[in-house]
């Protein structure tokens, strides 16, 4: 039923970053800050030296920051000013019925990155 078909690849649930940031901050033992509109591409240009300090301070794996993140993609994801909605009807009708809680999985993956010493 799915051969030759094109599907929206989305989990189907909706979340807003403003609701997720406090949970991410809590995971890292931090207070969530307010909104500061800026592009990460510009803001993070000077982040490599800070990242090197964090690697040393927290005994992290020595991964260069540019190997871990695309600031252009992050700007796109975090800067979207509309709710992203994509129908999952077609893929469910074709039998793809599994789903996950996107917020929960995000927090689990971030916790896993901490365990692997990728992030502090």
Please name every model-derived segment.
Residues 1-73, 87-89, 93, 110-116:
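Mid/C-terminal beta-alpha module of Rossmann-like enzyme folds, strongest
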Residues 35, 101-102:
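Residue-level detector of family-conserved "landmark" positions at structurally sensitive sites
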Residues 38, 104-105:
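Residue-level "edge-of-site" marker
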Residues 74-78:
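A conserved mid-domain beta-alpha-beta active-site/ligand-binding segment of alpha/beta enzyme cores
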Residues 81, 116-120:
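Short, charged, surface-exposed hinge/linker loops at domain edges
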Residues 93-99:
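Aromatic-glycine-rich donor-binding/catalytic loop that engages nucleotide-sugar donors
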Residues 99, 105-106:
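Conserved beta-strand edge residues that scaffold enzyme active sites
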């Amino acid at each position: 039923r799915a051969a030759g078909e094109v599907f929206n690849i989305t989990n189907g649930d909706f979340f807003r970053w403003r609701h997720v940031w406090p949970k991410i901050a809590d995971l890292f033992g931090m207070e969530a800050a307010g909104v500061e509109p800026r592009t990460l591409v510009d803001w993070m240009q000077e982040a490599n030296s800070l990242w090197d300090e964090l690697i040393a301070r927290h005994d992290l794996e020595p991964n260069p920051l540019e190997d871990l993140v695309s600031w252009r993609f992050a700007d796109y994801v975090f800067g979207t000013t509309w709710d992203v909605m994509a129908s999952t009807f077609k893929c469910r009708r074709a039998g793809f019925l599994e789903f996950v809680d996107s917020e929960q999985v995000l927090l689990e993956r971030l916790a896993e990155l901490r365990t692997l010493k990728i992030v502090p």
